[in-house]
């Protein structure tokens, strides 16, 4: 289910009340028919004056740039591995960039030393392994084949493998199924090192 204007306003109010930075993010898969929706959504976000908007799809960048008040960040799914990519996103007007989680600490340090942009890294969380239009929850538990899904997307759902690993399944606002890694990425031991490096 797509968030309403009231949902976004409520979230923004809670964030501001907590004294935190407000940031919105886009999905990494955008269909042609969804471009108009995001164009309107950027207008709404601009009115809310977020600190940053994280862009995960190349096609959304030109739409977002039309809204000059938005500080756009090239997010992790844009595969930022090298200095040329950072230079490209600076030329596109990015306010910052999120590095690929596949980089080594030495590679991160090098990019920080040559980057024209402020950089971020993912520190804690599960990486996405797969995304699909096919929804396991809706198909098996929500009677999706009857025409209207009754599955509660907030209900915890997992896939298991032969080693008994549990892969969390989450559903986005467009009913896409996202399968996450069974193990969390954790760089908490390197937080101080990263901060000293300038991330």
What are these regions (language model features)?
Residues 1-88, 92-199:
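Active-site pocket-lining/capping segments in soluble small-molecule metabolic enzymes
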């Amino acid at each position: 289910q797509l968030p309403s204007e009231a949902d976004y306003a409520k979230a923004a109010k809670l964030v501001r009340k907590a004294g935190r930075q407000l940031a919105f993010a886009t999905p990494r898969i955008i269909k042609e028919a969804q471009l108009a929706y995001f164009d309107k959504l950027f207008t709404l976000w601009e009115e809310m004056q977020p600190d940053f908007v994280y862009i995960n799809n190349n096609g959304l960048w030109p739409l977002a740039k039309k809204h000059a008040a938005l500080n756009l960040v090239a997010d992790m799914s844009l595969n930022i591995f090298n200095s040329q990519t950072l230079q490209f996103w600076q030329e596109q007007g990015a306010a910052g960039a999120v590095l690929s989680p596949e980089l080594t600490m030495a590679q991160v340090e090098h990019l920080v030393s040559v980057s024209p942009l402020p950089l971020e890294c993912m520190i804690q969380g599960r990486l996405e392994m797969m995304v699909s239009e096919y929804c396991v929850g809706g198909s098996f538990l929500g009677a999706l084949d009857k025409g209207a899904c009754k599955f509660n997307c907030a209900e915890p759902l997992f896939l298991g493998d032969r080693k008994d690993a549990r892969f969390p399944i989450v559903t986005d606002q467009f009913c896409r199924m996202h399968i996450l890694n069974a193990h969390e990425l954790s760089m908490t031991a390197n937080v101080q090192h990263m901060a000293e490096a300038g991330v």
